[in-house]
UniProtKB/Swiss-Prot annotation:
Residues 1-23 form the signal peptide. The keyword Secreted applies. One of its GO terms (molecular function) is toxin activity. It comes from Scolopendra morsitans (Tanzanian blue ringleg centipede). The lineage of its organism: Eukaryota, Metazoa, Ecdysozoa, Arthropoda, Myriapoda. This is U-scoloptoxin(15)-Sm3a.
Length: 73
Protein backbone atom coordinates (compact mmCIF):
# COMPACT_ATOMS: atom_id res chain seq x y z
CA UNK A 1 0.00 0.00 0.00
CA UNK A 2 2.84 2.40 0.83
CA UNK A 3 4.45 1.76 -2.55
CA UNK A 4 1.28 2.75 -4.34
CA UNK A 5 1.05 5.99 -2.37
CA UNK A 6 4.69 6.88 -3.05
CA UNK A 7 4.32 5.98 -6.72
CA UNK A 8 1.20 8.13 -7.00
CA UNK A 9 2.94 11.10 -5.33
CA UNK A 10 5.96 10.68 -7.59
CA UNK A 11 3.76 10.67 -10.70
CA UNK A 12 1.88 13.78 -9.52
CA UNK A 13 5.16 15.62 -8.90
CA UNK A 14 6.46 14.66 -12.33
CA UNK A 15 3.28 15.87 -14.01
CA UNK A 16 3.21 19.24 -12.24
CA UNK A 17 6.93 20.00 -12.46
CA UNK A 18 6.95 21.26 -16.09
CA UNK A 19 4.26 23.82 -15.28
CA UNK A 20 6.42 25.41 -12.60
CA UNK A 21 9.62 25.17 -14.63
CA UNK A 22 8.19 26.93 -17.68
CA UNK A 23 6.82 29.93 -15.80
CA UNK A 24 9.09 32.98 -15.83
CA UNK A 25 9.49 35.09 -12.69
CA UNK A 26 9.81 38.88 -12.66
CA UNK A 27 9.47 41.61 -10.02
CA UNK A 28 7.37 44.64 -10.91
CA UNK A 29 7.50 47.81 -8.75
CA UNK A 30 4.11 48.99 -7.49
CA UNK A 31 4.37 52.50 -6.03
CA UNK A 32 0.68 53.22 -5.36
CA UNK A 33 0.23 50.95 -2.32
CA UNK A 34 2.49 49.43 0.33
CA UNK A 35 1.14 45.89 -0.05
CA UNK A 36 -0.97 45.71 -3.23
CA UNK A 37 -3.93 43.35 -3.52
CA UNK A 38 -3.68 40.24 -5.66
CA UNK A 39 -6.02 41.68 -8.30
CA UNK A 40 -3.88 44.84 -8.52
CA UNK A 41 -0.75 42.75 -8.95
CA UNK A 42 -2.37 40.64 -11.67
CA UNK A 43 -3.34 43.75 -13.59
CA UNK A 44 0.07 45.40 -13.15
CA UNK A 45 1.88 42.24 -14.22
CA UNK A 46 -0.36 41.72 -17.24
CA UNK A 47 0.13 45.31 -18.39
CA UNK A 48 3.90 45.25 -17.88
CA UNK A 49 4.74 41.79 -19.18
CA UNK A 50 2.07 40.46 -21.54
CA UNK A 51 0.47 43.58 -23.06
CA UNK A 52 -2.63 43.20 -20.89
CA UNK A 53 -3.20 39.45 -21.40
CA UNK A 54 -4.17 38.25 -17.90
CA UNK A 55 -4.51 34.61 -19.01
CA UNK A 56 -0.70 34.29 -19.25
CA UNK A 57 -0.20 35.26 -15.59
CA UNK A 58 0.01 32.05 -13.56
CA UNK A 59 0.63 33.45 -10.06
CA UNK A 60 1.44 36.70 -8.26
CA UNK A 61 2.78 37.50 -4.81
CA UNK A 62 2.48 40.83 -3.08
CA UNK A 63 5.57 42.24 -1.40
CA UNK A 64 6.61 45.61 0.03
CA UNK A 65 5.88 48.09 -2.81
CA UNK A 66 6.29 45.41 -5.49
CA UNK A 67 4.62 42.43 -7.13
CA UNK A 68 6.36 39.18 -7.97
CA UNK A 69 4.89 37.82 -11.19
CA UNK A 70 4.97 34.29 -12.55
CA UNK A 71 3.90 34.19 -16.18
CA UNK A 72 4.13 32.15 -19.37
CA UNK A 73 6.04 34.14 -21.98
Amino acid sequence: MERKVFLLLFVIVLLTLPGFMSAAKKEIPYKRQKFPKKSQCIEACANALTNGDKSKITDVKSRFYKCICYYNP
